[in-house]
Amino acid sequence: MTPTARLDLVLAKLGKCPSREKAKAAIAQGLVYVNGQVCTKASAVVTPADKLEVRGCAIPFVGRGGLKLARALEVWGIDLSGLRCVDAGASTGGFTDCMLQAGAAHVWSIDVGHDQLHESLVADERVTSLEGLDIRLATPELLGTEADFLGSDVSFISLGKVLPSLAGLIHAGAHAVCLVKPQF
């Protein structure tokens, strides 16, 4: 470790958290202690002399979005076992990870950004990463089939602008969970 570094980076580098995103989540949840004191600031500067602990249970997904989708699946009784799913607005892949842990057979992770999807998901043969793709340009032909389930957590664009494209990616009768952002 360098003489001083950000807490979230150090937790990931030392393997106390599997990724920087999970480190940030654990910090935000009050699960990280520096020298016996809870620390809720991911950018806090730590040194090699500091004692770092992660207590309790951090989120079980690569991103916090997975918690949102997991709760929706639970409340609405949606079973993803064996389904082909789309994660629209994948980012780090919280929804993708949740879908896989819920039994999805395959997930197409679509995001207009680049190099955001967690490396564990990029390496997973059940995941097709379609980064750099505007969701409005995605088609069933691009996927090779219509999906059985769609999860959407798009940012920086109104859900209303992408909903027609999203609906075109799934077959009739398929379920979808789409988050609505208050800024739109």
Where are these regions (language model features)?
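S-adenosyl-L-methionine
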Residues: 106-161
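Conserved S-adenosyl-L-methionine
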Residues: 98-106
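Conserved alpha-helix/loop element of class I SAM-dependent methyltransferases that forms part
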Residues: 64-84
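A short glycine-rich, Lys/Arg-flanked "PGG" loop and its adjoining helix->strand segment in the class I
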Residues: 160-180
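Conserved class I S-adenosyl-L-methionine
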Residues: 81-91, 99
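Residues at the N-terminus of the alpha-helix immediately C-terminal to the conserved SAM/SAH-binding loop
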Residues: 91, 95-96, 113
